[in-house]
């Protein structure tokens, strides 16, 4: 995936300069190991983004922060996901996946998110790289060329890491509530998407990370389902599954098969490794 990393940086340079690079959606029909790593990295980021929302609601009640806008919450959830997925410099798989998350945002047509509280996709890509670079500027020097020198990436990383360690993470060694995983039946031709998600281990990895690093106080479920006709085919989090007794509240992270199916069909469009490995 080394060439893809270079292409990703090149694309981000174009995006940050205002150049038009975005590609029309199409089914590439290509399903190889690199493509699956690429898609897995983006899907993993989305799942951990929703986990950020869940932890903000369950542990710190930040989803109801009076001074935060919806955009503030989305930005915080992106930063949360990046910190949780922060790869070690020598972790090739982790590096490939976090760069795939960046590249995945660079594939998104900005107009799709115009009426949503999220930052523009190229900004979300930039922010991921900024935090990764800020965690260890010497080891991630390759990202420096696409980062604005005025961006205090090291300070942003340190601030977010201190927030997560000080407010959210549990160091008691005690086990909170366990996380349930539910793979709903696929419908409408979503069998391959369901199989991909199961094989990827994204939900299981998220469950393990949540249980190991945070003390969950309420019932929590990661559910994968066919969302057509029920909800927007994306990923989302709900802390509104409220019970009469607050102790029985249920927190749910949902991953839609349709989103995964679309990503598998879109593949590495624009990031194909034309020249092979170096």
Task: Tell where the protein language model's regions lie, with residue ranges.
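Bacterial N-terminal signal peptides that target proteins for export
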Residues: 2-9
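Short pre-active-site segment immediately N-terminal to the catalytic Zn-binding motif
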Residues: 31-45, 266-278
């Amino acid at each position: 995936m080394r060439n893809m990393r270079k292409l990703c940086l090149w694309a981000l340079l174009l995006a940050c300069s205002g150049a038009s690079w975005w590609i029309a959606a199409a089914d590439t029909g290509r399903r190889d190991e690199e493509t699956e790593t690429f898609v897995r990295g983006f899907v993993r980021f989305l799942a951990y983004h929703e986990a950020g929302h869940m932890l903000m609601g369950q542990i710190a009640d930040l989803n109801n922060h009076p001074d935060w806008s919806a955009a503030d919450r989305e930005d915080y959830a992106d930063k949360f996901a990046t910190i949780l997925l922060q790869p070690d410099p020598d972790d090739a798989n982790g590096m490939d996946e976090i760069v795939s998350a960046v590249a995945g945002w660079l594939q998104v047509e900005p107009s799709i998110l115009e009426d949503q509280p999220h930052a523009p996709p190229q900004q979300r890509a930039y922010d991921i790289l900024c935090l990764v670079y800020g965690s260890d500027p010497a080891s991630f020097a390759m990202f420096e060329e696409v980062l604005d020198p005025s961006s205090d990436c090291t300070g942003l990383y340190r601030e977010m890491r201190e927030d997560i360690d000080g407010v959210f993470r549990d160091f008691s060694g005690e086990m909170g509530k366990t996380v349930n995983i539910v793979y709903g039946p696929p419908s409408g031709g979503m069998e391959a998407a369901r199989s991909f998600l199961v094989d990827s281990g994204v939900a299981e990895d998220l469950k393990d990370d949540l249980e190991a690093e945070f003390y969950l106080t309420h019932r929590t479920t990661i559910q994968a389902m066919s969302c057509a006709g029920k909800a927007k085919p994306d990923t989302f989090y709900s802390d509104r599954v409220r019970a009469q007794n607050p102790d029985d509240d249920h927190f749910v992270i949902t991953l839609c098969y349709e989103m995964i199916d679309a990503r598998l069909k879109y593949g590495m469009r624009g990031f194909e490794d034309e020249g092979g490995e170096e």
